[in-house]
């Protein structure tokens, strides 16, 4: 009740001020249009004397503007105290337009009184313009009172609520990767840092093609880790993008290493720029389980659908058969012919020759028993199916160039050996990714076993476009490599790729055990998963209720997504969201980030302008400086075939001459 009385009293005061304002405007017209007023017979003697006294004592009419200014002042005060019915569509543009028109008509009409026309004409025009101007000023003032003071549509994308303070301090150590950033907070762009102080807790880099994950993140990982003396294994899907960076950066930053690192390349497309390496070298296979692991890796890389069918009869059979062949080559003549090409060639010999040879060795007899039972039992269709499921996928890998690279060893795969640190780049080709990816998967599995040991150098495993190869043991490497100083960085487009190619269970293990994550633009389930990972934060919500008499504003808080899926789906190139992990001794209060990773493009261009191509390793020149690459590769291919023919011939002769074994040969 008291509030209503106060409002009524305020309304009366505002009406009084507006009335005085109108009287002042009328006084202005009466004084400056006096001749017209006298002609119309509306002059009043008492009013004349009052106005003359005002002018004599206060100089009210010394200028035509004085009464107008006082009138405008009182009009303004009356409008400020008026509570109008709020209108959502009312805008400042509309108000300023009306006020500008009113100001011009009200104040800039003095020249009308000087026009060489009759007093009647002058007064009529002056009164009309002044009245119209006053009405416009009154409308503008009243509209201002109806304007909503809080425009809830200023921030339609909720940028202010979803911006947050991020890490601004550089935290660097001997292992860290540090990326400068720009982030938006409190209507300003701030400078900050993404501090990956513990890269050994593994890193995932996500993003659709063109989101900048290689340029902004992966390239920086390679450069900074080389500067800090990491040995390195790089899977370069689009060879030689990453390899060229690694080679040139290593050549320019060798002072980070106690022992000068060696640079090695495996490239099936260009043997001139490729070293040779046997991934099943006998020195690194001490047990038949190592042979099984190699067979398992190669088969699942050739048949990605088998990943989710592990344990099935027609999945295990070819793996067992190929594992037996690899282990046979390991024990035959102390591993002299233990190479991947020799294993493929031996598999493609007649099974009537291969089975007796393999079963003549006691350690392989049980491995081959299912095949021997089918053969001796006459189940030829079953046997043919088992053998074909091994031969058909592996036959895709019969290539002279691939045989050349994989049939000899110019270096070993223990890249983090303190005495011989290495930077190894293996190159794939998008046009041949299924074939090359299978062979490179073999290198992956072997390297994982060799580097994940104590007492070695700190090392980095960088896999670009992870789904293009099956990386056996990846989940175990992430889970256990931290104590052995192995930093893993995985780049791919989204989680659905990983689920498709690695299976739901293994993909979930990889996703949930990684400590550092960067994500450019991703959509769908991946964006939802990331949003849930980043959690919720307390956000302010404001609502306005409008009625005829008043506007009520309510402000409340609620928990909402810190970075919603819609934000992640709409990230521009170079913008990343993610989180990092910290250490006991290096605490990071704000682990989550939503920022643009700042890359000095001018510096990058200067560096790239001085890059040298990866050098030729083998020029394949004969004594007369003729190019003999094709012939050398073909000779190697034919030599492997001859080696296998000789092995089969010698072994069958041995079995035939041994009374205890000759029963294995079926006539």
Predicted regions span which residues?
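Basic- and hydrophobic-enriched, low-structure N-terminal and domain-boundary segments
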Residues: 1-211, 215, 220, 546-548, ...
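P-loop NTPase motor domains
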Residues: 25, 42, 149-153, 194-486, ...
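A short glycine-/small-residue-rich loop at the edge of a beta-strand within enzyme catalytic domains
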Residues: 52-56, 166-172, 438, 465-468, ...
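Hydrophobic alpha-helical segments involved in membrane association or supramolecular assembly
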Residues: 75-78, 82-83, 441, 445, ...
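N-terminal short leaders/motifs
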Residues: 169-189, 368-381, 516, 522-523
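Low-complexity, polar-biased intrinsically disordered regions enriched in Pro/Ser/Thr/Gly
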Residues: 183-189, 303-313, 541-558
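Conserved ATP-driven motor cores of ASCE-family P-loop NTPases powering translocation/secretion/packaging/pilus
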Residues: 478-480, 484-487, 491-581
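N-terminal charged/capping segments associated with class I S-adenosyl-L-methionine
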Residues: 592-595
